[in-house]
Every structure is written in structure tokens, then in C-alpha cells.
């Protein structure tokens, strides 16, 4: 399958790229800094660009079978990069007639799905503006005409891939999940349509 991965230079994104190549996919890795994607493989193409640059986004989307977004925000404070960037992806998908979109978000975007400490203390006091943009991103995707799945991982760790994780419709089972397992789940969703139009939580 031909897939574009946005956020390819991030910790979860780069793991998704590696695993996708291992599974035989043809990957277009979209990264703000191409030098941070140090992979040599016959099935990878790298596009350096800003997610807010629509023409660059469209270049990455055109000709793909599916799109994976592992975009993240690396700074606190008011920010619209997720919603604006995702808007560019969705616009390009519709123009290029690419239907399938798997998006990584986070536990906490739905009411009461992040647990008391994180949901009632950390998000409101520290991450409020970050989560406001994640919610804007979610609403854009839900209003789109693509085949979408938004996954809600809990706290991401750098532990090795286990291949064993819990998927729930509501609250996640635990507070942690290896990034490598999140990557594994997103790649499975390329062909597994069980969760289409849903927001499954993933946790260990």
C-alpha cells in the first residue's frame, strides 16, 4: 500500500515509518526537517515541508492509498498547528481523492476519558490550549468526507513494541502505551475497518 505519514520525524511517527517499511508499504515521510529522517530504503520517499504549506502537503498526499497523521505539538501555549495542518491534509485528500485517514490524537479529547488527575488537573492547568487544538482537529475530521479513524493513546512511552494492547470505545484501560504499539495499531487500521468513524482508545 502507498501511504503518506505526517509527523514522520516525531517519536511515534518515525516508528510508524520503520514498521510500515517492514510490512512492505511504500512510504512518503513528511517531515519539517528531512535530515531528521535518517532512513535508507528503496520504498521510502521523504518530503521536507511545513504542514501549514498546502502545496507541500498536497504533494505528499497525491497518489497515496491512505494517510497517517502522527502530528504532535512540541510547545505549550496557544497553537493551531494541529487543526490548521489537519485541515490542509483533509483538503488535499479530497482534492486528490484519497479516502483513508488514520489520525493519532490523545486520551483526553473526549469528556472524562483521561482519568481524574490528567483530565481534571494536568489538562486544565497545563495543557488546556494544546487540547483545545486537538479538539478542533477532531471536529474537522468528523465533519470531513474521508474514511477516518482517530485513535486516543494514553501516556506514550519509549518501551519496546509488545503487540498486545487494549482497545476501548470509552475510557482507556491504563495510563501508558508504548509508541511502538501505537504505530502497530495505526498500520493495522489501514485495512481493518472495524473502527471506521470512531475514536478508539489504546492503552497497555
Description of each model-found segment:
Residues 3-23:
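N-terminal Rossmann NAD(P)H-binding glycine-rich loop of SDR-like oxidoreductase domains
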Residues 61, 65-68, 102:
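N-terminal Rossmann-like NAD(P) cofactor-binding module of classical short-chain dehydrogenase/reductase
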Residues 74-101, 130-132, 136:
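NAD(P)-cofactor binding segment of oxidoreductase domains
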Residues 138-160:
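Conserved beta-loop-beta element that borders a ligand/cofactor-binding pocket
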